[in-house]
From Swiss-Prot:
InterPro entries: AAA+_ATPase, Apaf_helical, Disease_R_plants, LRR_dom_sf, LRR_R13L4/SHOC2-like, NB-ARC, P-loop_NTPase, RX-like_CC. Transmembrane segments: none annotated. CDD domains: RX-CC_like. It holds the Pfam family WH_DRP. GO terms for molecular function: ADP binding; ATP binding; ATP hydrolysis activity. ATP binds at residues 185-192. This is ToMV resistant protein Tm-2 netted virescent. (Microbial infection) Interacts with tobamoviruses mouvement protein at the plasma membrane; this interaction triggers defense responses leading to programmed cell death. Residues 63-83 form a coiled coil. LRR repeats lie at residues 225-248, 305-327, 388-411, 449-472, 510-536, 585-608, 609-631, 652-680, 689-710, 712-735, 736-758, 784-807, 810-835. GO terms for cellular component: plasma membrane. Its main location: membrane. Keywords: ATP-binding, Cell membrane, Coiled coil, Host-virus interaction, Hypersensitive response, Leucine-rich repeat, Membrane, Nucleotide-binding, Plant defense, Repeat. The gene is Tm-2nv.
Length: 861
């Protein structure tokens, strides 16, 4: 979509202009002027793109070509900027005056071409009267349909009986906080249907009632007028002083209102000035539905939230059956063939438990012959035409996103369906693509801003939370299949990305591919063998089992590639030859290799000046490159659990001495690094480091970490692996931000309360000797939620987790994980005061014969 490309161009031009100003000063003032002009013009064009799209959606086909021209212009400008930056960096590096002059002329000529195209676009815009406003007629039609549906007499709910009963009990509870029930969830789950049935069941128990559709662009005056009409306020009072008269009446009435589809909190701030508090003695109630959990949380508090989930398979098929046969119990599957029933179940499975998708699909099938052939054709087309009815509703949520968040949402479509996606990956890929840019004056890191975007997507119920980290952040997430299809369709329509299935075709279209993802080995290899021209490719995702994929990549330069992700899913360890051409990807910012692969990154990788993230999965035995790093932007260097592998497989002495060539101000993750190649004085330079892992920790490193004033003030995660018992006692009490600590020692290590950070949330002790003294220290940690003891030796056979006389023991601990204990035969907790928040006791590995007290037995199941 044009607005996405325009945003990318704006962000890149801001970055380039800033770099020119800092690095070049007055010598390249003319370049900065051109870059600034590009930025201004792209902002101006972006300001009226939404209006142009609204006119096209409203039936004005004349603007279609204009939008296409804008999209092509934005793409060409992005290409120019991506091609421009490496050239200027190269000319600066060698300081060739002639080369600089030649490049300047070339760039100036391209800018002149762009200026002429901008003039033409602006002329056409004025001709079609496209202005900077938002008037999406198609949305208005959809809103009207929703208003009709809101008052339609359809209260049948399938599979939501438990939700209904819980909500009814909550709503009638006299102690309901704020008097609000918030039904939240992704589009299509049946929030409105459930809320309507609930509302209609209880409204007779109140003196007045009303249901209103709030909409995406609400007006408080219209909503209040609607409420006034429904509760019987006289016409004269509505005309004279609506708000005061309405509030006066509601103060003495017990009311219930259903506010459907609330998109943001601003409208509530206006409405609550008129609506009396619901938690008063009168006992009024408000039911809201929203796609955004934060809206419900803001209006009614955390306790008001009730999150709907997709239907289970049998409930889904029950709803499908009701809709297919129009709720006629006399007309059912009795006369259908078993094959037709199976096809029906497969169709329902494709709907992913979303009631809206099931209803739309059933409605379409009712218009067809009830034959296996007809239904099979529908099944084969699932993911495209069948979901069109849902797409309009889902697209509302997409269009409501801030422009900067839209490409972040579309990125989920690059992954296979039902794939669990790490937040770390998403955040750093968004940054690599310049979807997230830190503006001047903003002290927050790009990672923090990207995390805000991810939290917002989850809050809007567009993305499903899978796991949280030790400190409550999002660790991984998923996207529902229905929304995944929306991402793929929108991306294909706008040329944002393409899947393998639609990558083939006109060579001209293939040459314009900017992002592509492969889920199949055969399709991937066939595509590369076709020798496509991929001159504009920015992102390449490969989910494969065939290790030969790397050899096929060797034939391409990928000169504009920003992001490369290779995920190998074969079960065996495979040696791969990573092409030396990887070092020619001058625009590469993000590289992730995952799976059972063994090989070496080419040394030319260190020459990539724009590299920001190298992330090697824990199963991948990939030898790092050697040489002096030239990138001043490297933020994350992650060899996850690489330490155990590298000691036996590779010599890395040629790599780590060059760690000093990294730009210390940007580095945030360094995992793992052998201590023998790591001078403790380097710690003082890593002022923004958040995650650090060191192998074979020496006494000098322990001493440096233990000084009174912390050397790593931003550190949040610390992993230390000792190859021998340290003589120095570690002291981490001066590190307030460390929330996750991993200590791997050789049996003995003197520890006390000063050894640990004060705000520790997750602690892992590996190969540790545990005695009653260290256990007494651990019991006092005020914020510890997860404790893992991995292959530890226990001096006493019995580990008593209860507190002393005051009962103070693990006040916040939620998970205790004991793996392959040595010398432990009994774990007890004999009181209910100790570990009041413990939810889970995990015994894994070799743990035969360990007895548990009754309370712990229940938590270990």
């Amino acid at each position: 979509m044009a607005e996405i490309l325009l945003t990318s161009v704006i962000n890149k031009s801001v970055e380039i202009a800033g770099n020119l100003l800092i690095q070049e000063g007055k010598r390249l003032y003319w370049l900065k002027e051109d870059i600034d002009w590009l930025q201004r013009e792209m902002r101006h064009i972006r300001s009226y793109v939404d209006n142009a799209k609204a006119k096209e959606a409203g039936g004005d086909s004349r603007v279609k070509n204009l939008l296409k021209d804008i999209q092509e212009l934005a793409g060409d400008v992005e290409d120019l900027l991506d091609d421009f930056l490496p050239k200027i960096q190269q000319s600066n590096k060698f300081n060739y005056c002639l080369k600089r002059s030649s490049f300047a002329d070339e760039f100036a000529m391209e800018i002149e071409k762009i200026k002429r195209r901008v003039v033409d676009i602006d002329r056409i815009r004025k001709t079609y009267n496209i202005i900077d406003t938002d008037n999406n007629n198609d949305d208005c039609v959809l809103l009207d349909r929703r208003r009709l549906f809101l008052h339609a007499d359809e209260t049948e709910i399938i599979g939501l009986d438990d939700d209904f009963n819980m909500l009814q009990a909550k709503l009638l509870n006299q102690d309901l906080h704020y008097g609000v029930v918030s039904i939240v969830g992704m589009p299509g789950l049946g929030k409105t249907t459930l809320a309507k049935k609930l509302y209609r069941l209880i409204r007779d128990q109140f003196e007045c009632s009303g249901l209103v559709y709030v909409s995406q662009q609400p007006r408080a005056s219209e909503i209040l007028l609607d409420i006034a009409k429904q509760i019987g306020l006289t016409e004269q009072k509505m005309k004279e002083n609506l708000e005061d008269n309405l509030r006066s009446l509601l103060k003495i009435k017990r009311y219930v209102f259903l506010l459907d589809d609330v998109w943001d909190v601003e409208i509530w701030d206006d409405l609550k000035l008129v609506l009396p508090e619901c938690d008063s003695k009168v006992g009024s109630r408000i039911i809201i539905t929203s796609r955004n959990s934060n809206v419900g949380r803001y209006i009614g508090g955390e306790s008001s939230l009730h999150a709907l989930q997709p239907l289970e398979s049998e409930k889904s098929f029950e709803l499908f059956t009701k809709k297919i046969f129009n709720f006629d119990d006399n007309n059912s599957w009795a006369n259908a063939s078993p094959d037709l029933v199976n096809i029906g179940r497969n169709i329902v499975g494709r709907c992913g438990g979303i009631p809206l998708a099931i209803v739309v699909t059933a409605g379409m099938l009712r218009a067809r012959e009830r034959t296996e052939h007809a239904w099979n054709r529908v099944l084969e087309s699932m993911g495209h035409k069948v979901q069109d009815g849902c797409a309009k509703v889902l697209a509302l949520s997409y269009n409501d996103l801030p422009i900067a968040s839209r490409p972040c949402f579309l990125y989920f479509g690059l992954y296979p369906e039902d794939h669990e996606i790490r937040a770390f990956d998403l955040i750093n890929m968004w940054i690599a693509e310049k979807f997230i840019v830190v503006n001047s004056g903003n002290r927050r890191e790009a990672e923090d801003l990207a995390e805000d975007v991810l939290n917002d997507l989850v809050s809007r119920n567009l993305i499903q939370l899978a796991k949280r980290t030790y400190n409550g952040r999002i660790s991984s997430c998923r996207i529902h299949d229905l929304l995944h299809s929306l991402c793929v369709d929108l991306a294909k329509e706008s040329n944002f990305f393409h899947t393998a299935h639609d990558a083939f075709g006109d060579p001209g279209n293939v040459a314009r591919l900017r992002r592509i993802t492969f889920y199949s080995d055969n399709v991937m290899i066939e595509f590369f063998r076709s020798n496509p021209k991929l001159e504009k490719l920015r992102v390449l995702f490969c989910f494969a089992k065939d290790p030969s994929i790397f050899s096929h990549m060797a034939y391409f330069d990928f000169k504009l590639l920003h992001t490369l992700v290779v995920v190998m899913s074969q079960s065996f360890q495979a040696y791969v030859t990573i092409p030396s051409k990887f070092g020619n990807m001058t625009c590469l910012r993000y590289l992730r290799l995952e799976g059972n692969i063994c090989g070496k990154l080419p040394n030319s990788i260190v020459k990539l000046t724009r590299l920001e993230t190298i992330d090697i999965d824990r199963r991948s035995l990939i030898q790092p490159p050697s040489g002096v790093w030239e990138s001043k932007h490297l933020r994350h260097l992650c060899y996850r659990d690489y330490g155990q592998a590298c000691n036996s497989c590779f010599s890395i002495s040629s790599f780590y001495p060059n760690i000093y060539s990294l730009h210390p101000n940007n580095l945030q993750t360094l995992m793992w690094i052998p201590d023998k190649f790591f001078e403790p004085r380097l710690l003082h330079r890593l002022i923004n480091l958040r995650k650090l892992g060191i192998l074979g920790v020496s006494n000098s490193t322990v001493k440096m970490l233990s000084i009174f004033s912390p050397v790593l003030k931003a550190l949040e995660v610390l992993k230390l692996s000792f190859s021998s018992d340290p003589s120095e006692q570690i002291k981490l009490s001066s590190y307030p931000h460390i929330a996750k600590l991993h200590l791997n020692v050789n049996r003995t290590m003197a520890l006390n309360s000063q050894s640990f950070p004060p705000n520790l949330i997750k602690l892992t002790l590996a190969n540790f000797t545990v005695d009653r003294y260290i256990l007494a220290v651990l019991k006092t940690f005020p914020k510890l939620r997860k404790l893992k003891m991995f292959i530890c030796k226990y001096n006493e056979e019995k580990m008593a987790l209860s507190g002393e006389a005051n009962g103070y023991s693990f006040p916040q601990l939620e998970v205790l994980h004991i793996h392959s204990p040595n010398g432990l035969s009994e774990v007890t907790c004999t009181d209910d005061v100790s570990m009041p928040k413990l939810k889970k006791l995990l015994l894994t590995g070799f743990h035969c014969g360990i007895s548990l007290s009754e309370r712990l037995k229940k938590l270990s199941k």
